[in-house]
Amino acid sequence: MQETIRNTFKSVRQASRELVMIGEQAINSILIDLAETIPDCSSSILEANRRDLDRMDPADPMFDRLLLNEKRLEIIAADIRNVATLPSPLDIVLEQRRLPNGLELKKITVPIGVIGIIYEARPNVTFDVFALCLKSGNATVLKGGSDAHESNTAIVECIKTVLRRNGINDNTLSLLPSEREAAGIMLNAVDSIDMIIPRGSQKLIDFVRQNAKVPVIETGAGIVHTYIDKNADTGIAAKVIFNAKTRRPSVCNALDTLLVHAAKLDDLPQITAPLQEKKVVIYADEAAYAKLQGSYPESLLERARPEHFGTEFLSLKLSVKTVSSIEEALDHIAEYSSRHSEAIITNDPEAKAEFLKRVDAAVVYANTSTAFTDGAQFGLGAEIGISTQKLHARGPMALKELTSYKWIIEGDGQTRSV
């Protein structure tokens, strides 16, 4: 396997060199062609997806992420068309100046080169990643999870068909075997891969970070908090909490822990009442549990254990903790946050300003849902993930974050004397 994968990396690297010479118009045409081809590929993709789904328990939080259907494929095709309409992130002049010796300097955006993606049971990521990487001039190596391997294989074949039809080296995109050994080879491919982005659980991200020699940008895992301040509007709190928890509980911007100021506990039954509709299980600390008893369904209410406050649930589960001050809320977030998305609900301008200033996260909200952490919602177009680190990229990683830069220097015979 090792030799085969290394040969794959060489082919992808060659394809990345060829990709540099493909113009923006040609890239956009390929993306439009792919969007129009998805309906033709849908039967083979959905058949493969069904085989993957048959091996997974429908109660598994990953089931919804794995699921593809006609509607989701239509949305994917629309997203790809949207990427085609976005401005190219390449060849943008970031700096330009003329030196006293006559040299002309330009700093321009360029592709990163070869981007590796390690991800779990999310076959839609295969389409998203390809579209964004192609638009930004990057070749791509994919290492998907075994749960989605048949879906990913069908999707990659659909994409490669489009590449070949447009005269593009189909090694621009390669899918590695689903075995764990392939991930290890990829993480050490410093001569072949320029950057790796893991998308998935904290366990996956930790594995990549601890074992990679290739530079890594961490994305995805979100232990997300919303703090209800003592001066919060109860109606806004109820609406925001319901949306943040139940819109899509299996995604990384979904709410995991609700922090409630002790002075606001009397309103907790009203705030959590809408969650009953979706049968959200609440793990409450003693004070919150006592307040919810008799108002929240007994079958959905449990006492919280310490581990509940460090868990990304990815399902219809929510931990609730009572705090005595904004300071205690900030301390709790600092201890448990994955630095993804954090929110405060308050009518107090000073509390809001303090929270927004002091919380260390990629995205910090006031009086709105954390569900907005999304490249499309930010007006960035599609995203390749949500970076939770600080170097190179932070927050939604869109086209700009998939580029680097280089200096172009032009002269007419100048030589350096000193």
Curated annotation (Swiss-Prot):
* Entries under Pfam families matching the protein: Aldedh (PF00171)
> Got any disulfides in this one, which pairs?
none
Record-linked InterPro entries: Ald_DH/histidinol_DH, Ald_DH_C, Ald_DH_N, Aldehyde_DH_dom, G-glutamylP_reductase_CS, Glu-5-SA_DH, GPR_dom
**Pathway involvement of the protein, from the record:** Amino-acid biosynthesis; L-proline biosynthesis; L-glutamate 5-semialdehyde from L-glutamate: step 2/2
Name the family. Belongs to the gamma-glutamyl phosphate reductase family.
Main localization, broad class: cytoplasm
Known catalytic reactions: L-glutamate 5-semialdehyde + phosphate + NADP(+) = L-glutamyl 5-phosphate + NADPH + H(+)
Protein's UniProt name: Gamma-glutamyl phosphate reductase
Q: Where in the cell is it found?
A: Cytoplasm
Give the protein's biological function: Catalyzes the NADPH-dependent reduction of L-glutamate 5-phosphate into L-glutamate 5-semialdehyde and phosphate. The product spontaneously undergoes cyclization to form 1-pyrroline-5-carboxylate.
Write down the species: Chlorobium limicola (strain DSM 245 / NBRC 103803 / 6330)
